[in-house]
């Protein structure tokens, strides 16, 4: 067998094992939460001695990072598909489609949503170089949709400047995302994001109670439309 073929087979085998580790990690999240992640248990499920799994995942923190990247990527891919599949007649329809896709993913994947937007895992610090880009893809989708509203004139720009250091922070955000909104619009974007994540978390984590809402999805749509209306307020 040629050297290139052997290297390719080893790489494929490694990728398959790494994918299986992530899959088993997802199951652990569902069954035990982030605090219950165990590389030893994953090794047992793979039929490996516990020391062998460390050839693929160096630590529990590394497993958490892999699961974070996996969840952020899956969420963002879901949003991208929803935008592709939705015939949006306006920027506001696009914003609502994004929000619905985020909620749909969260309701389907409550344990993974908890990993992304629940309580931080004690002692774990996500490496920004591996998580920041993928973690902001959904935010970038919102910015893209809202930028279209600015382009149509539905969302008007003003001369309002936020106090420091807020204004400087907003300028960094504009540069990072290529976003044309002024400080007032960026503030409204933060309100939108906080409202969407907060409403979803209240539902997913059971904070509304079992009998309060007959159809949480309808309530979420109403909340999202109110947030969109704020964006267009003059």
Curated annotation (Swiss-Prot):
Chief location: cytoplasm
Domain HTH tetR-type: 15-75
SUPFAM superfamilies: Homeodomain-like, Tetracyclin repressor-like, C-terminal domain
Subcellular location as annotated: Cytoplasm
Record's keyword terms, sorted: Cytoplasm, DNA-binding, Transcription, Transcription regulation
One of the GO BP terms on file: regulation of DNA-templated transcription
Activity regulation (record text): DNA-binding activity may be regulated by fatty acids.
Domain of life: Bacteria
One GO MF term: transcription cis-regulatory region binding
One annotated Gene Ontology cellular component of this protein: cytoplasm
Gene3D superfamilies: Tetracycline Repressor, domain 2
DNA-binding region: 38-57
Induction field: Positively regulated by alternative sigma factor SigD.
Protein role: May participate in the regulatory network that controls the expression of MmpL lipid transporters. Binds to intragenic and/or promoter regions of rv1816, mmpL3, rv0204, mmpL11, mmpL7, kasA and mmpS3.
Quaternary assembly: Homodimer.
Record comment regarding domains: Contains an N-terminal DNA-binding domain and a C-terminal ligand-binding regulatory domain. The C-terminal regulatory domain can bind saturated fatty acids.
Stated name of the protein: HTH-type transcriptional regulator Rv1816
Protein species of origin: Mycobacterium tuberculosis (strain ATCC 25618 / H37Rv)
């Amino acid at each position: 067998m040629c050297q290139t073929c052997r290297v390719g087979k080893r790489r494929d085998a490694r990728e398959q094992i790494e994918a299986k580790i992530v899959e088993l990690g997802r199951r652990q999240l569902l069954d035990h939460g982030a605090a219950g992640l165990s590389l030893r248990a994953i090794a047992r499920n793979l039929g490996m001695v516990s020391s062998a799994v460390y050839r693929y995942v160096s630590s529990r923190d590394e497993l958490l990072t892999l699961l974070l990247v996996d969840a952020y990527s899956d969420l963002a891919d879901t949003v991208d598909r929803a935008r592709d599949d939705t015939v949006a007649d306006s920027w506001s329809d696009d914003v609502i489609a994004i929000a619905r896709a985020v909620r749909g993913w969260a309701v389907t994947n409550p344990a993974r949503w908890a990993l992304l937007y629940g309580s931080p895992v004690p002692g774990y610090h996500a490496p920004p170089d591996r998580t920041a880009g993928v973690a902001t893809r959904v935010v970038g989708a919102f910015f893209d949709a809202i930028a279209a509203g600015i382009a149509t004139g539905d969302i008007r720009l003003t001369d309002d400047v936020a106090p420091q250091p807020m204004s400087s922070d907003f300028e960094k955000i504009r540069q990072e995302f290529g976003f044309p909104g002024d400080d007032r619009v960026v503030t409204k974007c933060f309100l939108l994001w906080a409202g969407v994540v907060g409403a979803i978390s209240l539902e997913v984590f059971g904070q509304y109670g079992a009998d309060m809402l007959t159809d949480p999805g309808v309530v979420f749509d109403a909340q999202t439309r109110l947030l969109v209306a704020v964006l267009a307020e003059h």
